[in-house]
A protein has these predicted regions:
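N-terminal beta-alpha supersecondary unit
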Residues: 6-75
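Surface "functional belts" at beta-alpha junctions
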Residues: 8-10, 33, 100-204, 233, ...
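Residues at secondary-structure transition points
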Residues: 41-49, 80, 84, 88, ...
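Stable alpha-helical structural segments in soluble proteins, enriched in small hydrophobic residues
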Residues: 57-61, 96, 114, 207-218
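DPxDG-like acidic metal-binding loop motif
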Residues: 72-106
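Acyltransferase
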Residues: 200-248
Length: 248
């Protein structure tokens, strides 16, 4: 199924799906504004919760899925299993309804949302316009998936996997404050002790962070090929087998 092109801009009703981390999050938006949402921080229960959340949003709001204009999904990087589940459900909906698929980078959504709302997250004693924003998604051990954004929400360092050490981000920290956040930031706090290293409170991936980017992509015809789209895993999946247990 090839990507679908729209001839003209209009208000879009979009279902946003975020399953890249331990958070299972879904919302329904029109023109970027949230109409309904469901979210769980229980852990990786996406296979059980995702379709239930979607069905509840539709039923509780008397919403016919055929009214959807597109489905947006968080494309990663993040949990291999979580991404696979979210993308599979999103593609299934797009196939059955004949609507476009939108992919939103998980770190892009986190980084740009936080930069756009910087005064909510940056301490009052710090000039928010001089802060860099560094979302972190937990990988394994001291490794995180990360990127770097300026105060305008522009990406200045591409998405990458980094092993965090005491000198990580030093070229930026020596010049200006950097706000670290996301589910990978907590474990890095002991290593990143530079005076310019700031840490936000709990701020995890959520479908509500996708709204603006998904709506922009819809209006700019930035759609994926439903047949061939794959999540952005960044790294190959590694299954470990400790003793008699199999863990993903």
């Amino acid at each position: 199924m090839p990507a679908i092109l729209l001839k003209e801009k209009r208000m879009a009703t979009i279902l946003n799906i975020e399953t890249a981390t331990e958070v299972c999050s879904v919302n329904l938006t029109r023109d970027g504004e949230i109409l309904a949402e469901k979210e769980s921080h229980e852990g990786l229960n996406h296979s059980r919760l995702l379709t239930v959340f979607i069905d509840e949003i539709f039923r509780e709001n008397n919403f016919n899925p055929e009214q959807l204009d597109a489905v947006a999904v968080s494309k990663g990087p993040g949990s291999y299993t979580g991404l696979r589940i979210g993308v599979s459900v999103a593609k299934g909906l797009c196939y059955s309804l004949g609507i476009p698929l939108i992919a939103v980078g998980t770190l892009d959504a986190l980084g740009k949302y936080t930069a756009d709302h910087k005064n909510k997250f940056v301490p009052d004693s710090t000039d928010a316009d001089n802060v860099l924003f560094c979302p972190m998604i937990d990988a394994r051990r001291m490794e995180v998936y990360t990127a770097l954004f300026n105060a305008k929400g522009e990406k200045i360092e591409p998405v990458s996997a980094k092993i965090i050490e005491t000198n990580s981000f030093s070229k930026y920290l020596n010049r200006q404050p950097v706000l670290f956040f996301g589910n990978g930031a907590v474990k890095c706090k002991a290593a990143l002790t530079h005076p310019n290293a700031l840490f936000s409170g709990p701020l995890k991936a959520s479908a509500r962070f996708m709204n603006k980017l998904a709506d922009e992509k819809y209006n700019n015809n930035k759609f994926e090929d439903v047949a061939y789209f794959e999540p952005f895993y960044l790294k190959n999946f590694i299954a470990t087998v400790p003793k008699n247990k199999i863990l993903e």
